Amino acid sequence: MAAEEKDPLSYFAAYGSSSSDSESSDEEKEAERSKNRSIKRPFPTDTKKLPGPDELFRNVSRPAFLYNPLNKQIDWESRVKRAPEEPPKEFKVWKTNAVPPPESYQVAEKKAPPPELDMAIKWSNVYQDNGDDAPHANQAKSLEEEEAREDSPPSDDEQEKAFAIKKRKV
């Protein structure tokens, strides 16, 4: 029965190899594995490893071009490269149709509309109703003048004119 049982990982094994081979021994398998390991390593183990950081910084010196011979310090000011300065740009106001903020907003003063005729006068002219009772634009009077006339007694000429006008209406 042992020969009939299969290794569950044998499905993933390479083609043509089987785990049920009883011919190969454990020693032979270990020999093959050691050969495969030696083939996978590209670098031989005899090479020297890189030095550690402490050892490296003890041995490495700074390049001579960074030093000022008088001070023995790095002259960073002579090494600095600065971009050329551009002239300041002029501020240009964008032209938009947006409503300006309330602080800068000034109401544009509009011209007053032309004085319109009284609608009664306009309609009487349209329909040519220019009788005695038709309104006239030039007869507009202020209240002060009317009050002054009411206070004073009417003269004879004014009474006759008023009487003649009343006769015409009737």
From Swiss-Prot:
Record field: compositional bias (Acidic residues): 144-159
InterPro entries the UniProt entry points to: DUF4660
Region annotation (Disordered) ranges: 1-56, 124-170
Xref: Pfam families: DUF4660
Bias (Basic and acidic residues): 46-56
Domain of life where this protein originates: Eukaryota
Family affiliation: Belongs to the UPF0690 family.
Entry protein name: UPF0690 protein C1orf52 homolog
Species per Swiss-Prot/TrEMBL record: Xenopus tropicalis (Western clawed frog)
